[in-house]
């Protein structure tokens, strides 16, 4: 997906200014063969095959429609706001950061122990960072898979309501929750990337950060759901994340830390062979 708005000959270097002519060229009949060829080539690379076969032909068609609808959707947003362009700031941007844990007794200096903090290293990629006006930076996450209604609710008014958003993060960090709103956690981490990473802060430049998921169903239903996380919710989520990480790394102070009771999540765990769950 990133190459749609990348400079020619690059994979991730953002093109910058995107206007109507740029989008219409990529939606044109003349561009269709190049779009089709590019998608097939990327699928072949992903599945390590020389050609697209069987169900992957269907996948190719779905992705092609998704790419075209993404371009149409961006044009619709631009026109609905009376703009002649928007700016792509970053594509598949890696913004690693360190998250500070709670204070604990550190080295002894004189007669007192100097408090220290455990550092947790995070690494992640933001699919797309763009801006439709001077006061806002938008995080866009591409979702070609299914997005449930429960997850989608964090993209609506709940995301802009402090009390509702706070309740969502109670669910994010609840033990053995099958209704965990993963999208809320994902955008919270993106927010930390843009706050705690120097390059991320520079990209934002003091502007308001909003979030939006480009899901297949959402795009074709024309559901425009852009939201921001209130600072109070970010602070609460940060404390919850800190408590969770501290508990993992300090078992003596957190005797309730245990293996999950929901074995479905074990399917995606890199440590399941060690755990033996």
Feature locations, PLM:
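RecB-family 4Fe-4S metal-dependent nuclease core
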Residues: 1-277
């Amino acid at each position: 997906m990133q190459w749609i708005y990348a400079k020619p000959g690059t994979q991730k270097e953002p093109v910058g200014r995107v206007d109507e002519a740029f989008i219409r060229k990529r939606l044109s009949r003349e561009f269709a063969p190049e779009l089709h060829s590019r998608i097939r080539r990327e699928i072949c690379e992903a599945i390590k095959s020389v050609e697209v076969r069987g169900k992957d032909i269907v996948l190719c068609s779905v992705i092609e429609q998704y790419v075209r609808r993404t371009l149409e959707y961006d044009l619709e947003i631009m026109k609905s706001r009376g703009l002649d362009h928007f700016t792509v700031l970053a594509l598949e941007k890696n913004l690693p950061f360190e998250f500070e844990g709670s204070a604990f007794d550190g080295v002894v200096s004189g007669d007192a122990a100097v408090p220290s903090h455990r550092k947790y290293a995070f690494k992640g990629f933001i699919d797309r960072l763009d801006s439709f006006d001077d006061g806002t930076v938008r995080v866009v996450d591409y979702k070609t898979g299914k997005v449930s209604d429960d997850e989608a609710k964090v993209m609506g008014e709940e995301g802009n309501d402090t009390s509702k958003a706070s309740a969502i993060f109670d669910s994010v960090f609840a033990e053995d929750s099958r209704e965990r709103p993963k999208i809320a956690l994902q955008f919270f981490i993106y927010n930390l990337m843009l706050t705690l990473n120097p390059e991320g802060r520079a990209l934002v430049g003091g502007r308001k950060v909003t979030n939006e998921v480009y899901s297949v169903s959402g795009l074709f239903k024309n559901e425009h759901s852009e939201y921001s996380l209130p600072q109070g919710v970010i602070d609460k989520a940060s404390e919850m994340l800190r408590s969770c990480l501290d508990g993992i790394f300090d078992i003596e102070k957190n005797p309730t830390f245990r293996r999950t009771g929901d074995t479905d999540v074990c399917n995606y765990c890199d440590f399941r062979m060690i755990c033996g769950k």
